[in-house]
């Protein structure tokens, strides 16, 4: 009797690097970020897994260190996450190191996975040696293939640093957010980009994101 092998969807990793420093309490930006992340996870969990399985990890950096808040997990399996809590400094370099470790670990992200998307959110200036860690990330054989997007929250964000983080594979600019609605719009762009890739026959071909053309007439800010 002939046996058939059922093909499994290839992972499409999305790694979110979230600033949870003390300054994120200003204007309740941390609350807006929590609500936007929940909306993102809810949307991605509903995507088809025929071609690609979207997997999400959240790495936070605040206090004195970075840590993995949500390990890389299929989006449809993430039922709920604890809210991010803001405090302390901005150890962004530590987040880059954790992201690099995750991408280089083939038990976490196998060779058959599609190119990762790394999303950086920050409202301030890094308080550690971020340059060394970032150079390792962008020069790594595996990590350099990732698409990198960034959002600056408020006037205090280090926009030059964030511009250095962004590459030209997917979104060629830093999105600037000054309120909850704009934070939400950025994550809608992330969701649209990742969803588009997961439904494509060529998920490694990265779409262009034009932040100026994002619709905002359907936003529900009741959770903010």
Describe each PLM feature range.
Residues 154, 204-224:
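Extended acidic, low-complexity intrinsically disordered regions
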Residues 155-208:
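Von Willebrand factor A/integrin I-like adhesion domains
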Residues 11-12, 144-147, 169-172:
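Short glycine-/polar-rich loops that comprise or flank the Walker A/P-loop
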Residues 52-82, 159-167:
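Short beta-strand-loop
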Residues 6-69, 79-114, 117-121, 127-129, 147-161, ...:
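Von Willebrand factor
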Residues 48-49, 110, 138-146:
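Arginine/glycine-rich "motif VI" loop of SF2 helicases in the C-terminal RecA-like domain
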């Amino acid at each position: 009797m002939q046996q058939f092998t059922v093909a499994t969807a290839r992972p499409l990793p999305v790694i979110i690097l979230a600033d949870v420093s003390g300054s994120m309490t200003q204007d309740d930006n941390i609350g807006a970020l929590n609500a936007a992340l929940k909306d993102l996870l809810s949307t991605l969990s509903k995507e088809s897994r025929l071609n690609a399985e979207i997997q999400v990890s959240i790495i936070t950096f605040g206090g004195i260190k970075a840590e993995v808040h949500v390990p890389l997990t299929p989006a449809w399996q993430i039922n709920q996450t604890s809210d991010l809590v803001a405090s302390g400094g901005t150890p962004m370099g530590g987040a880059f190191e954790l992201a690099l470790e995750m991408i280089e670990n083939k038990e976490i992200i196998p060779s058959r996975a599609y190119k990762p998307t790394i999303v950086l959110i920050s409202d301030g200036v890094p308080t550690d040696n971020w340059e060394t860690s970032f150079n390792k990330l962008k020069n790594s054989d595996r990590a350099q293939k990732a698409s990198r997007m960034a959002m600056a929250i408020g006037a205090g964000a280090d926009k030059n640093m964030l511009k250095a983080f962004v590459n030209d594979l997917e979104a060629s600019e830093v999105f600037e957010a000054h309120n909850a609605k704009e934070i939400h719009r950025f994550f809608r762009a992330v969701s649209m980009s990742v969803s588009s890739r997961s439904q494509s026959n060529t998920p490694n071909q990265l779409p262009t994101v034009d932040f100026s053309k994002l619709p905002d007439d359907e936003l529900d800010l009741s959770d903010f």
